[in-house]
Each structure stands twice: as structure tokens, then as C-alpha cells.
Amino acid sequence: FVPHVRMMRTDYQDIGLAQLFGLPFAVLRKPIPFDTTTMNFNWQVWDTKAFSLYSRSTDRIDPQGAELAVSAVCRFLARMNVITDNVYGGYESTVLLEEELLTVKSQASGLFVPLVSSFTSVEKGQPLANIIDPLSGEIISQAVSPDVGIIFFAKDDSLVMENEILFKIVGKLHK
């Protein structure tokens, strides 16, 4: 992922507070039925501000990503006058609706070889990844960008199944 803060779209979200973390993006997403069982959703329903921070990697140790997340929390606390430390200003967060992200799915199963990573600018039609047949070593499919934008999410595993999400792209904001 591109480091970002997420909030569920309830009647209680506060995107202005989410932007105080100073991460590149603040993402709003529609809750799904499962979310009603989560603490994050219920905190919002009971008028508590609740945020989820996403760093670059979720299943590997990423010291740089962890440092960025800690800085974001410290930045938020400093901007809320909870702590008095001086913290780097961070980004002016761009607000996104999750359903507006462009999705690129695999057209075949095989070995996944990405050609771009998260936070990379891409052009319409640009190759994003190759899917390779593990038996022959030949490229059997290629994922391409559907539009101009920035890679928001990039799959990180070596194996891919057909119809699996490979990339999510922030489309060009000003057309």
C-alpha cells in the first residue's frame, strides 16, 4: 500500500481529523455487514473518532514503513496538542473514496512478476506485471494500467490466481 489512513463512511467520520496524520492519502470506505462487528465501526457509531493506519507492508517487517506510521501518530498527537514534540509536517492528505480506486485483476494463474510498485505513476496501457507459466517459463498474461494514475496497492506475493486483485490505482484526479 501507499501509506494512508482509512475511515469507514458512517455519519460520524471526520476526514479533517484523518488528514492530521499527514499521510499521502485519507481513504473513506463504505462499511460492509462484517464491519458492524468491529470495534472501529462501533467506536464511530458511539461518537468516538476511529482511524486505521496502513503502512507499506502488512505481512513483512518493514522498518521504514513502521517509522512512517509512528511519525504519523506523533504528528497527529502534536497537532491535537496532546504532545509537544516537533514532528515533520508530512503530506497534505488527498481524500479518496475507496470505490473510486481502479482495480486491475489477473487474467491467468501463475507466477506474478510486478513491473511497478506502490506510489509509482503510471500511464494508460502501461504494463504493470507479467504472469508467467511456472512449467514453461513463458509469459501467459500481462496486466496493464486502465488509466493514468498512481499505484495505491500492489500485490506482493509471488503466486497469483486468476481474477485476483493485483493493483489498485488512484485515477488521475484532475481530468
What are these regions (language model features)?
Residues 1-175:
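Structured catalytic-domain cores with a bias toward divalent-metal coordination
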